[in-house]
Amino acid sequence: MEMLNAIILILFPIIGFVLIFSFPTKTLKAKTASPSNPTSYQLIGSILSFNKNRHRLLQWYTDLLRLSPSQTITVDLLFGRRTIITANPENVEHILKTNFYNFPKGKPFTDLLGDLLGGGIFNSDGELWSSQRKLASHEFTMRSLREFTFEILREEVQNRLIPVLSSAVDCGETVDFQEVLKRFAFDVVCKVSLGWDPDCLDLTRPVPELVKAFDVAAEISARRATEPVYAVWKVKRFLNVGSEKRLREAIKTVHLSVSEIIRAKKKSLDIGGDVSDKQDLLSRFLAAGHGEEAVRDSVISFIMAGRDTTSAAMTWLFWLLSQNDDVETKILDELRNKGSLGLGFEDLREMSYTKACLCEAMRLYPPVAWDSKHAANDDILPDGTPLKKGDKVTYFPYGMGRMEKVWGKDWDEFKPNRWFEEEPSYGTKPVLKSVSSFKFPVFQAGPRVCIGKEMAFTQMKYVVGSVLSRFKIIPVCNNRPVFVPLLTAHMAGGLKVKIKRREQCDSMYI
């Protein structure tokens, strides 16, 4: 089967070149276009440039966007298809809010993730999306869910995360801190979403099969979008070969595992009768009368969103703090100022400097590097870029964080103070700026803005505070890590660290 997979990958370029050379030579001349757009040819579009840069797409797109006066580029694809990529905040607002209904995710996008996420909230449009959004928004605004989530967070940090890190200190071990944070986040999101405890933070145990299946399914689903020839992954799926065979097996594991948990939960609820004490999302969705498949798709979507985004953001923040001792010191000062009674929910909301650090880390290393919609009808972006019906339209948080026009000449510096109205000074309460979500769209914006945004900040601030007050995180490698974008981004090779217990442990403040 692997041989057949290779044949498919070889066959498509051959067919493409046969088609190219079936046309007059003049069709191979580059089309006249903006100098900021990649070189494009009739029929094959920019596939040559795309293929040349496919292993550095982030930097390639960012370089091209810097050359563009409007911070927007057009990438021509095979047979006339186009992708418009923008780092212009006005365009982002138009796509995500002003003309929201003209920019659904679209069938090409939902096809990519449909096998894994089905019709879940993050992979649906129209009435299906709207109905799920209303239900989820209602649940996420409930005080009971907020308190339930915070209690789980506190238990996971105190009873699992801190002991794991303490053990690493005592044994002098090097640990992959990215892996620790991913396992921690998976435990938390499964408890909140499913009311089920995978207990995967024990590093002496092998990675649970469900966790590995999620990783494989997410990676291969994301790589579908990077195929130079869009149809390749569909042919591989039809033939059940190569990566698509592995994807099918991983998705089967995910779906069967989650469905088994759902059936057990339904049985528990049927026996118990009253669901008032069942606070997890699964219990809430089942109580609302939704079918098993719809509930499965919804909770898988929330698990995918909740497990990787927060762990990715925190991984990059801890690395950035290791390079900026002065910033780490200011976070510790903020923690000390909260007193010795422990951090409650309201205390976390007031940790503005820690939040600024998280925002700055996500500006430079966004958990979701890009997101795409599809134009339902012809349109014109605010910068004058014309759109055709069916165009793929991508806004690009990674590139936006690197635009001088958006963030100034110091865009490449890690400066949490840029998020304040005035430079924070000792003894004064710093006031965070109101930064447009279209300038900083890491949580999306408009009607699709992330409904778990505040919950995510709560989790990240609590974890950062709990860890930093007790430990110094020291990367063992001095090289700059490599940012890898998939469904959610991660650090290539993980973040290998030594952990040192602080001489004056400030854990009394957590």
Curated annotation (Swiss-Prot):
Superkingdom of the source species: Eukaryota
Gene3D superfamilies (UniProt xref): Cytochrome P450
Main location class: membrane
Transmembrane portions of the chain: 3-23
Binding site for heme: 450
The entry's keywords: Heme, Iron, Jasmonic acid signaling pathway, Membrane, Metal-binding, Monooxygenase, Oxidoreductase, Transmembrane, Transmembrane helix
GO molecular function, one term: iron ion binding
EC number: 1.14.14.48
Pfam families given in the database record: p450 (PF00067)
Catalytic activity: a jasmonyl-L-amino acid + reduced [NADPH--hemoprotein reductase] + O2 = a 12-hydroxyjasmonyl-L-alpha-amino acid + oxidized [NADPH--hemoprotein reductase] + H2O + H(+)
EC class name: oxidoreductase
One GO BP annotation of this record: jasmonic acid metabolic process
Membrane topology, from the record: Single-pass membrane protein
InterPro entries in UniProt: Cyt_P450 (IPR001128), Cyt_P450_E_grp-I (IPR002401), Cyt_P450_sf (IPR036396)
Entry's induction text: Induced by wounding.
Cellular localization per UniProt: Membrane
GO cellular component labels: membrane
Cofactor(s) needed for function: heme
Function: Hydroxylase involved in the oxidation of the plant hormone jasmonoyl-L-isoleucine (JA-Ile), a bioactive phytohormone of the jasmonate-mediated signaling pathway. Converts JA-Ile to 12-hydroxy-JA-Ile.
Additional free-text comment from the UniProt record: Plants overexpressing CYP94B1 are jasmonate insensitive and present developmental defects in all organs.
Sequence similarity: Belongs to the cytochrome P450 family.
Name used for this protein in its record: Cytochrome P450 94B1
Organism: Arabidopsis thaliana (Mouse-ear cress)
